[in-house]
Regions:
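Sec-dependent N-terminal signal peptides
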Residues: 4-14
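A structural boundary/capping signal
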Residues: 18-216
Length: 216
């Protein structure tokens, strides 16, 4: 994923959304699946996803995080230009599971919305842009934040283990955001609210609009 530019440290309400998320196929999705050469594989993948959510919904939070991270990480990674022909394209969860592959932000977004369906509060979930040691560009992970004064847990497509950020020596924090706000953070805690400068290319806002309003 390309470098996400952010700054302007201000107290700011980033995005508010009162809708609950539901993973529901619409007529466009069904037509796409029915006309796909991968129809059987797609239906099997969606069936497994549905079964997984039913099996996981009543578990405690630590088990939910671990199982969601493991389940979604089994999906094969593929860079955006290979998968959709667009550089740094952010998929909706339905696109991710129908296509069966994605880039780092697609994993993080799929985990975010899956955990919302499993009853985790959106106030506790943040997409986070990070730098990876000895790697060019930036990377995206999902954070679970129980207390903003403690190290968040990291759900990462590069690791099947859910660990506190303080134990991920390979990652350096940049910025974390969800539907409600955005934060600067360290390995040990969230520090201050920020405003993200999307430079007229707010991919997150587009994902939220497509998910909640367009059911894509």
């Amino acid at each position: 994923m390309k470098k996400l530019v952010f700054l302007t440290i201000l107290s700011s309400l980033f995005f508010t959304n009162s809708f609950a998320y539901q993973f529901v196929l619409n007529s466009k999705d069904k037509n796409l699946i029915n006309n796909s050469k991968q129809k059987s594989a797609i239906l099997k993948r969606l069936e497994k996803y549905s079964e997984f959510k039913n099996e996981t919904k009543n578990l405690d939070i630590d088990k939910k995080l671990g199982k969601v991270n493991f389940f979604i990480n089994k999906t094969l990674p593929e860079f955006d230009t290979q998968s959709v022909g667009i550089d740094d394209y952010w998929m909706t969860p339905k696109e991710f599971f129908i296509k069966g592959f994605g880039d780092c932000e697609d994993y993080a977004i799929a985990k975010y919305f899956t955990l919302l369906q499993l009853g985790v509060k959106k106030e506790s979930l943040y997409l986070a842009v990070v730098n990876v040691k000895a790697s060019a560009g930036t990377h995206m992970v999902l954070l679970y934040v129980e207390n903003k004064n403690s190290s968040p847990l990291v759900l990462d497509n590069l690791s099947f283990r859910v660990l506190p950020f303080s134990k991920r020596d390979d990652l350096t924090p940049v910025v974390a955001f969800n539907e409600l706000n955005a934060y600067e953070f360290t390995k040990d805690k969230f520090t201050q609210l920020v405003t993200i400068d999307w430079q007229n290319n707010n991919k997150w806002d587009r994902v939220l609009n497509r998910v909640y309003k367009l059911n894509e």
